[in-house]
Amino acid sequence: MSMLPSFGFTQEQVACVCEVLQQGGNLERLGRFLWSLPACDHLHKNESVLKAKAVVAFHRGNFRELYKILESHQFSPHNHPKLQQLWLKAHYVEAEKLRGRPLGAVGKYRVRRKFPLPRTIWDGEETSYCFKEKSRGVLREWYAHNPYPSPREKRELAEATGLTTTQVSNWFKNRRQRDRAAEAKERENTENNNSSSNKQNQLSPLEGGKPLMSSSEEEFSPPQSPDQNSVLLLQSNMGHARSSNYSLPGLTASQPSHGLQAHQHQLQDSLLGPLTSSLVDLGS
């Protein structure tokens, strides 16, 4: 631990002051402290000093200087989350000023796609909604075991994933809501399928029989008229009766011929009467 020339602080002490001022939110004082540091390359390459410079640059809206610091130096993984937030928030602010309105979820996604994180503050692992895939894997595994973690378990999950307790709580809440919505949709589809199947069964014809005629077909079907063959058959029978030697029912052989003729006329009237009536009805 060597004292910096003409300054009175060691490198470790400078790093400690930078961390304390950052955590306390004294960013203006932190900026003045950084400005007072001597021109020492070894000191200015200290990671705590570089991180402090990035925070001050963001606070003052000097985003070009911020991007230069983040892209020019390799930072330790434990500093990545903080520096990634600075990178993304700076690009969000610039995009909002350019568009003249706040960014929504889609707008922020497009900014992230357009300005990906530099490898100096990112380990290359794919992220989803700023959650690393490794963190999401831990949360999914716990969700399969218990969708309702206790406050103590949420704190443990936050430590294991590098997330905050609020982020863990929101992840479980959103996941439960998505699962409930998916279950409701699946249940609705099942009910609709069952209802459609029941309707098809009700409309199916009787097994082994012909499809039933609808009531409209029955109401508007015309009455069947006697065909020509029936009329010819009737006339043939009557002629056969006149030439036959056998007596007709109700008559004896000893009856005179005029009685037989009268009975034939009576039989003709009784048979042709309904037939004629039907033909008249059809013609009207």
UniProtKB/Swiss-Prot annotation:
Expressed in phalangeal tendons and in skeletal muscle and in head and body mesenchyme. The keyword Nucleotide-binding does not apply. Residues 124-183 bind DNA. SUPFAM superfamilies: Homeodomain-like. Residues 168-284 are annotated as: Disordered. Residues 227-284 have a biased composition (Polar residues). One of its GO terms (molecular function) is transcription coactivator binding. InterPro entries: HD, Homeobox_CS, Homeodomain-like_sf, KN_HD, SIX1_SD. Belongs to the SIX/Sine oculis homeobox family. Interacts with DACH1. Interacts with EYA1. Interacts with EYA2. Interacts with CDH1. Interacts with TBX18. Interacts with CEBPA. Interacts with CEBPB. Interacts with EBF2. This is Homeobox protein SIX1. The lineage of its organism: Eukaryota, Metazoa, Chordata, Craniata, Vertebrata. The gene is Six1.
